[in-house]
Amino acid sequence: MWRLRRAAVACEVCQSLVKHSSGIKGSLPLQKLHLVSRSIYHSHHPTLKLQRPQLRTSFQQFSSLTNLPLRKLKFSPIKYGYQPRRNFWPARLATRLLKLRYLILGSAVGGGYTAKKTFDQWKDMIPDLSEYKWIVPDIVWEIDEYIDFEKIRKALPSSEDLVKLAPDFDKIVESLSLLKDFFTSGSPEETAFRATDRGSESDKHFRKVSDKEKIDQLQEELLHTQLKYQRILERLEKENKELRKLVLQKDDKGIHHRKLKKSLIDMYSEVLDVLSDYDASYNTQDHLPRVVVVGDQSAGKTSVLEMIAQARIFPRGSGEMMTRSPVKVTLSEGPHHVALFKDSSREFDLTKEEDLAALRHEIELRMRKNVKEGCTVSPETISLNVKGPGLQRMVLVDLPGVINTVTSGMAPDTKETIFSISKAYMQNPNAIILCIQDGSVDAERSIVTDLVSQMDPHGRRTIFVLTKVDLAEKNVASPSRIQQIIEGKLFPMKALGYFAVVTGKGNSSESIEAIREYEEEFFQNSKLLKTSMLKAHQVTTRNLSLAVSDCFWKMVRESVEQQADSFKATRFNLETEWKNNYPRLRELDRNELFEKAKNEILDEVISLSQVTPKHWEEILQQSLWERVSTHVIENIYLPAAQTMNSGTFNTTVDIKLKQWTDKQLPNKAVEVAWETLQEEFSRFMTEPKGKEHDDIFDKLKEAVKEESIKRHKWNDFAEDSLRVIQHNALEDRSISDKQQWDAAIYFMEEALQARLKDTENAIENMVGPDWKKRWLYWKNRTQEQCVHNETKNELEKMLKCNEEHPAYLASDEITTVRKNLESRGVEVDPSLIKDTWHQVYRRHFLKTALNHCNLCRRGFYYYQRHFVDSELECNDVVLFWRIQRMLAITANTLRQQLTNTEVRRLEKNVKEVLEDFAEDGEKKIKLLTGKRVQLAEDLKKVREIQEKLDAFIEALHQEK
């Protein structure tokens, strides 16, 4: 039935559409036109004219996916105008788009539902963590109550402030463009840019002036840093030298090391180095020849020496003092032009400007290092070897320039120090004095000539050198004045020879070759030579070098054997003195004695590890109890014992033990352990070893012990671990057997007996001697002691009446005692009564506690069975057992820390201290003293000098 009805309704709809619609004749398919907007073509229409039917329809839209409704449709009369077939494509496109939005909407709704369902499934899979909410601290949930986030937000800079702090990129781009224009040739902005730059030149000038001080300060700091690392480098080089010596001395089987043959001048230089150390140590002066270069400041001493060495090796400055300590330069012939220091293996290639600059810088650093705080110059010598082709073999010493006035920045004694250094070198009767005089200044301003004439009045070992002759020829009006100087007629001094040299034009960057060429050219064209005022052999540094070398070797051959004989006699005297004073001892110098002492000290430190654990624990436990016994008795036991019942006693004890463990006990235990380690270490270090003990090491051992103890620090985590262990030990109240019970009673009796003895002594000092001592030793009581005695007797009567009297006197009791004493004619102060009562009651309490302790000997059975007996409560025994057990456990823990960690750390500190002392020569001289040490040092030095002199003399004879 319903199908018939549906068909009837469909027919009615069709008939209505046919009746009221007019279509377009053609082949347009009806299913592609919209229900409302399309015109329907009908084959039975009488005309082909388009009409606008009055069609009524509902607002419901239908698509191809929906069925037509079964109810009757009501069409509204809509009139359609004529539209061509080609203009219907927008309607078709709109229809399709309207269909598409339903697809998208449906997909979105379905996808959202699916996503929500998936999210719910995942949420169900996550476990419920609400029951673990207690793990998070409450402060996290209440953080907004403690922290004002709004206040923090206001304190932070705003976005506008941050924008202000950002760089101005427009200015940066503008600056870069200006810079680009500056480097671009021919740019129109170049002129303007440079004009702006000229305008800022004045500001830059002031900035440079202000920055100059900073640069000087930075250079000074850099110099100090270089000196610091120079010391480290010297120490490493010294260690390397010693190791190399050990390797060379090692005699492997079947291996023969080749012995290098040294040159004659090198052997002589080594002799002078050893003699220099010997002279500085014993304040003496050897008589071996050397060329001493002296002169006024800025007279050209260093330049002459550089011309002889054929290299600019010294630091120089315009008018300021640069030579601050003597520099010994050993010149020898070799294939390569190199320089090296005595205590360093680095070679400086003098043909390279980089190495020359490094050498000058190194010499300046060594000079500054030699100069002590508050001084300007130093007498310590810097030893430098220079080798090269064509160099004359000799040894020269460049001394600081002689000055007439001490300027600001110099030490007050600078002038006297320079004179003393110069005299010390020139007073050697075999020293060749190379006197340098500036020819460009007036002869009357010379200082050094007077000094030289004093040291060598006959001129038998002086060579006079006139520098800057080119300037003198230009400035001096009378050339004959130069002739008078060279002939020795102007200065009040005599010399072996007179020379005139030119050492440059005053430019420090000139090379040696350029200076030599200039010197030769000058003398070839000089009027002084042309007019025979100067002789040819008296000019140029080449002739000077040859003359000085010949004179030097002549003096060496004449004096070296005499010096060797004198050192042989000195050696014989020292050896005889040693045999007479120390016949059974080896000749050990200071370094060898230090090595011997070092081995002994390390052996004694190792002995600490051989101490038995039992000994460690005994001394630790005893020392710890001595440290804490007063606190245990006075602050824990006595206050708790004043309580009326055992519950209050235990509560008081637990509280006080907890406070003590948390604050004081671990620190006290570590202090005791550290002091015990020091005592044992000192005992091993100072314990005499019998007849083999050498007291010469006592000062060194004491210094090593003190320094090692000062450097040693206990492990920082020891207190934390001890606190836990001690707290657990004091918490244990269970005594397991009768032996522990008896040990606790014995420990308690010892502690109380010691306190009782101290109390008896205090009362005796308070009341004076008793009748026995008064009769036997003729001692009497003072008036104050008599008052204390009467007060004590009165208080003892009160205690006998009430043996369970509390620890403190009431005010009425004090009044009663005072009135009783006044009735007997004794005036007493209430404070005196309280002081006397404290000692009397303390003695009474300790005696009562000892009696109670004796009763508790048989109380272990009651304690073990937990019997409640008010007459026999032994809580104080349990307290002392807890203290005793804590002491034993603490001693065991500290012993483990000592043997496992601290002893090894102390041994490491001792090794470090010994290494530091080994590098400090002054420390060894201070700690290893005595006639025996000094005699061995002298003997070693003299033997070394004599052996080197003999080797040099032998080589000198072979060369002849």
Curated annotation (Swiss-Prot):
The keyword Protease does not apply. Changing R683A: In interface mutant 1a; strongly decreased ability to mediate mitochondrial fusion. Changing L939P: In OPA1; impairs protein folding; loss of function in promoting mitochondrial fusion. GTP binds at S298, G300, K301, T302, S303, G317, K468, D470, T503, G506, N507. Changing H631A: In interface mutant 1e; strongly decreased ability to mediate mitochondrial fusion. Changing S545R: In DOA+ and OPA1; decreased GTPase activity; loss of function in promoting mitochondrial fusion. Residues 1-87 form a transit peptide. Changing C551Y: In OPA1 and DOA+. Changing N728K: In OPA1; loss of function in promoting mitochondrial fusion. GO terms for biological process: apoptotic process; axonal transport of mitochondrion; cellular senescence; cristae formation; endocytosis; GTP metabolic process; inner mitochondrial membrane organization; intracellular distribution of mitochondria. InterPro entries: Dynamin (IPR022812), Dynamin_GTPase (IPR001401), Dynamin_N (IPR045063), G_DYNAMIN_dom (IPR030381), OPA1_C (IPR045817), P-loop_NTPase (IPR027417). Changing E320A: Decreased GTPase activity. Changing K779E: Decreased ability to mediate mitochondrial fusion. Residues 467-470 are annotated as: G4 motif. Changing Q659A: In interface mutant 1c; strongly decreased ability to mediate mitochondrial fusion. Changing R557A: In interface mutant 9; strongly decreased ability to mediate mitochondrial fusion. Changing K819E: Abolished ability to mediate mitochondrial fusion. Residues 295-302 are annotated as: G1 motif. Dynamin-related GTPase that is essential for normal mitochondrial morphology by mediating fusion of the mitochondrial inner membranes, regulating cristae morphology and maintaining respiratory chain function. Exists in two forms: the transmembrane, long form (Dynamin-like GTPase OPA1, long form; L-OPA1), which is tethered to the inner mitochondrial membrane, and the short soluble form (Dynamin-like GTPase OPA1, short form; S-OPA1), which results from proteolytic cleavage and localizes in the intermembrane space. The paddle region plays a major role in driving mitochondrial inner membrane fusion. It binds lipid membranes enriched in negatively charged phospholipids, such as cardiolipin, and promotes membrane tubulation. A conserved intramembrane region, named membrane insertion loop (MIL), within the paddle region inserts deeply into the bilayer, further stabilizing the interactions with cardiolipin-enriched membranes. OPA1 dimerization through the paddle domain promotes the helical assembly of a flexible OPA1 lattice on the membrane, driving mitochondrial fusion in cells. This is Dynamin-like GTPase OPA1, mitochondrial. It comes from Homo sapiens (Human). The gene is OPA1.
